[in-house]
Amino acid sequence: MTETDLITVGENTDDTELTNAVTTDTPDVKATAATVSLGSLSTMVLPELRALANQAGVKGTSGMRKSELIAAIEECRGQANGTSVNDGPSRDHGGSATAISTEALAAQEEQNYAIVEVSRRERRGASREADVTAGTSTAEATESDCQGTADDDTRTLQGGQSDTKTEERGPDVGNDQGVEQQSSSLQPRGDDDGEGRQGRRGRRFRDRDRRRRGERSGDGAEAELRQDDVVQPVAGILDVLDNYAFVRTSGYLAGPHDVYVSMSMVRKNGLRRGDAVTGAVRVPREGEQGHQRQKFNPLVRLDSINGGSVEDAKKRPEFGKLTPLYPNQRLRLETTPDRLTTRVIDLIMPIGKGQRALIVSPPKAGKTTILQDIANAITRNNLECHLMVVLVDERPEEVTDMQRSVKGEVIASTFDRPPSDHTSVAELAIERAKRLVEQGKDVVVLLDSITRLGRAYNNASPASGRILSGGVDSTALYPPKRFLGAARNIEEGGSLTIIATAMVETGSTGDMVIFEEFKGTGNAELKLDRKIAERRVFPAVDVNPSGTRKDELLLSPDEFGIVHKLRRVLSGLDSHQAIDLLMSQLRKTKTNYEFLVQVSKTTPGSMDDD
């Protein structure tokens, strides 16, 4: 049975009464159709017109519109009037008979119109009562009945189906604007068939649509919590998008158990993207699980923000308004005598809190191993720092290795995931780091790699039409630069240090374009050499081009003078000889302090000799 049949069956009772009323005491059906005036026909609903047309002998009424049915009935009226005119002389024997016939026709017309009005009022009252007492689904069925006055029955039925499908689909908060447009386009467009009826029905529909939009849109009110509700605690990272927000409960990627947060709650409590929030959601009652309108469970209570109270979070400063400075507090990476990687970095490229460093590496030069050594050194020597390792477009086995070898927060999106996941993970991770810096904490972010992040933005972002060499869109270069530019030392307290890897010599013109964009943004650079790595010498550091800007702020005056003499000696050698000499001398000492003392005693000249 189709939906058209259901609509027709739902109105059979009224249509039968109407048909019986119209055809009572009228031997000629066509004459009865003729007695109904044009005004009466325009006030009838579509099923009533079809029933009247069928009684009048009109065929094919199921596919006719309202205007076509009225025209067909008018044609039958004309035929009936013609018959009456032709038969008039034989039956009309006087003025009294004509007057009686006219009065009878007028009385019959008034009776038909009264019956139609009573039937319509009864059905309207039943619809209004059902709309008040029944749920949303009953209200939609009543709306389909009331829409019988629309010009196009097929279009009305399709609109009802679309509205029903939208209701069943639930409040997809990712498409709020589309839902609102669809809801507004499904407004009933009926004729004014009663004084005040259109206004009452319009207000009823507007109120219902307003409730729907309030439930579905991101600007909706907060979910109310009743006393008898059972709540369940939740915690996660807040991800604020355009018109809605979610608490990511399973990490930094979207998951099926994420919690929806209304925009009113976000604005009311001053929430920001990257906040670590705790709260509660309402547990669905028995039998309510299958009838939930919302795809995600909403947050009904907010307990804490970043481990503190909600009121304290409203008073925190904004990251963009904090004053950045050059790094002036050093991060010591030296750990054990046999861990030469961190010892070389301390000598060649000292790192401070708030540093923006790039590890420029060709493939298979050991950049991932260097990142692991740096991460372990930070967690061992700098316990006050919060470590975050962000792996973008990385191999799954390297993610597992990093998670097991690093005592820190590892955030990863493997290469088998879409580019949009890479960009989402990186953006949410850097926003989380900013929120920690706003609290005055020192954060260290290790990114592998900035080149792959640029590729992901190039593939995920819409084309702007300005394509650079290598197929790189010009708009895809700004988001990775914004990520790297977040590193800074804050004057008011706290710092954000970013150490990112950049790939070169990959044979890709696009990778070279991305690297050239970031080349001048960092204030420290560690360059790896593939030829040194092919000789199985690790770390494969090219000493001469590596270094740190303003390194005198990180080193003591005595240490700065000795390091300066060391760099002058190594600059006279090629890259292979320089790293070999440095590694051989480091193996002879247990600490960098001993090595620098030895250099000061054995190296002739000073930084002032020229």
Swiss-Prot record:
Indicate the secretion signal residues.
none
Where are stretches of biased composition, namely Basic residues?
199-214
Keyword presence, RNA-binding:
yes
Q: EC number(s) per UniProt? A: 3.6.4.-
> Where are the residues of the annotated region Disordered?
117-227
Give a yes or no for keyword Heme in this entry. no
Extract one GO molecular function annotation from the record.
ATP hydrolysis activity
What Gene3D superfamilies does this protein map onto? Answer: 1.10.720.10, Nucleic acid-binding proteins (2.40.50.140), P-loop containing nucleotide triphosphate hydrolases (3.40.50.300)
Q: Which UniProt keywords apply?
A: ATP-binding, Helicase, Hydrolase, Nucleotide-binding, RNA-binding, Transcription, Transcription regulation, Transcription termination
Instruction: Please list the residues that bind ATP.
Output: 352-357, 364-369, 395
Q: Where is the Rho RNA-BD domain?
A: 231-309
What is a biological process (GO) this protein takes part in? DNA-templated transcription termination
- Biased composition, Basic and acidic residues: where in the chain? 118-131, 189-198, 215-227
CDD domains the record matches: rho_factor_C (cd01128)
Source domain of life: Bacteria
Q: Where is the composition biased (Polar residues)?
A: 178-187
Role played: Facilitates transcription termination by a mechanism that involves Rho binding to the nascent RNA, activation of Rho's RNA-dependent ATPase activity, and release of the mRNA from the DNA template.
Q: Which PANTHER family match?
A: TRANSCRIPTION TERMINATION FACTOR RHO
Tell me the protein family, please.
Belongs to the Rho family.
**How does this protein assemble?**
Homohexamer. The homohexamer assembles into an open ring structure.
| Name assigned to this protein | Transcription termination factor Rho
Q: Which gene encodes it?
A: rho
